[in-house]
């Protein structure tokens, strides 16, 4: 059986007042062509179908048309909700849809939703696990200690019947410890959403969503498909793709990726004004940084004639750097040791603030040092 794995469509997303929907629709057409050329049997969509829990009608129509075309091609489709989606809205008509071979995760009811497919190698079980928080799982297992995201997922899997003699695929939208993130993903405080990859050892392939960079985690068959396109300038160096997974007999799983070609790339442009103006005209989404010491007042307008889809514009020179240094120094002088420590901790820990325990240790050390000085 061959299936395609994609995730994090974020249909309807906007950035700096630019709508991505037209690009997203064209990329979904590319996915259809890849499915056709690869002769895929199914498509797995691992969450964050929409950018918002209440998506705009145009985004919903785009997804409806995409799913309809996949079904016209004879593919089975599996969809779960992500942290950006409303599990209730995603699962509308799920009972009716499954009769057509479209399997949509329902709002979590304490059980792992499973679908059994059949091919020449026997049964293949696809399990659907929508994005979960500990509080959602705790109510179904009141006798268990469920504090972290890992506790929650482990509890669900422990109470589910996963027959390891069969081929098992899990579609999941969570954060795996060690995965490389970008600015466009939501983060929790202190890394509480981390889940160890070993939790999924019973599954032959784990189709992950949530992280926007395509990547494998500990093994080739535990993989983030990545987002449909670049959604922040922290992703400019990423190559977006679709994962194509072919499962033979138990233990025989092959994975390769097929690149996606966005109608407009997202990239950084930097240089002196005359250098930037000498660049070829481009409708890519760009962040332009000028290095001129005295750029003309209308530099932004001038640059937009070469880059009409310029999303951000900035000037970095000796003056702006000096201004930044002065402001930073003044800000530091007006901050308490606790605030300075918090800033440093955030810098070292992906913008996560220090917890109460860290602050208590800091205060204890301060008292100890102040006592020695006296």
Descriptions of predicted regions:
Residues 37, 42, 246-374:
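Accessory, non-catalytic peripheral segments of nucleic-acid enzymes
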Residues 112-124, 129, 222-285:
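Binuclear metal-dependent phosphoesterase catalytic core
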Residues 1-68, 356-368, 372-373:
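N-terminal active-site segment of His-dependent metallophosphoesterases
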Residues 6-7, 43-48, 76-83, 103-108, ...:
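Active-site neighborhood of phospho(di)ester-bond hydrolases with catalytic His/Asp-centered motifs
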Residues 14-16, 49-67, 81-101, 106, ...:
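Metal-dependent catalytic neighborhoods of phosphoester/phosphodiester hydrolases
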Residues 40-58, 75-88, 168, 174-191:
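Active-site neighborhood of divalent metal-dependent phosphoester/pyrophosphate hydrolases
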Residues 99, 182-253:
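Conserved beta-sheet core of the metallophosphoesterase superfamily
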Residues 92-191:
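Conserved catalytic scaffold of divalent metal-dependent phosphoesterases
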């Amino acid at each position: 059986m061959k299936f395609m794995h994609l995730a994090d469509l974020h249909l309807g997303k906007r950035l700096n007042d630019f709508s991505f929907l037209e690009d997203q629709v064209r990329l979904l057409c590319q996915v259809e062509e890849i499915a056709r050329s690869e002769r895929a049997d199914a498509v797995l969509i691992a969450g964050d179908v929409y950018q918002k829990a209440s998506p705009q009608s145009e985004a919903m129509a785009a997804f409806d048309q995409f799913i309809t075309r996949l079904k016209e091609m004879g593919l089975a489709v599996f969809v779960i909700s992500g942290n950006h989606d409303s599990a209730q809205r995603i699962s509308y008509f799920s009972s009716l849809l499954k009769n057509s071979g479209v399997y949509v995760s329902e709002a979590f009811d304490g059980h792992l939703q499973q679908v059994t497919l059949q091919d020449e190698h026997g049964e293949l079980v696809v399990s659907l696990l929508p994005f979960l928080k500990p509080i959602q799982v705790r109510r179904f297992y009141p006798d268990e200690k469920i504090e972290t995201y890992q506790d929650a997922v482990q509890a669900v899997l422990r109470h589910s019947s996963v027959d390891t003699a069969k081929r098992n695929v899990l579609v999941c939208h969570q954060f795996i410890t060690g995965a490389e993130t970008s600015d466009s993903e939501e983060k929790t405080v202190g890394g509480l959403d981390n889940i160890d990859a070993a939790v999924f050892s019973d599954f032959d392939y784990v189709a992950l969503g949530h992280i926007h960079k395509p990547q494998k985690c500990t093994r080739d068959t535990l993989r983030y498909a990545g987002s449909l396109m670049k959604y922040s300038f922290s992703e400019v160096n990423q190559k977006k793709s679709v994962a194509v997974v072919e499962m033979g007999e138990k233990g025989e799983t092959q994975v390769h990726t097929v690149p996606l070609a966005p109608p407009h790339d997202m990239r950084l442009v930097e240089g002196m004004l005359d250098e930037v103006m000498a660049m070829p005209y481009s409708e890519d989404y760009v962040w332009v940084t000028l290095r001129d010491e005295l750029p003309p007042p209308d530099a932004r307008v001038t640059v937009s004639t070469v880059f009409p889809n310029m999303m951000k514009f900035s000037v970095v020179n000796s003056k702006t750097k000096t201004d930044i240094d002065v402001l930073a120094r003044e800000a530091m002088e007006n901050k308490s040791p606790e605030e300075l420590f918090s800033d440093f901790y955030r810098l070292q820990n992906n913008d996560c603030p220090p917890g109460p325990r860290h602050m208590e240790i800091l205060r204890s050390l301060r008292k100890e040092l102040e006592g020695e000085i006296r």
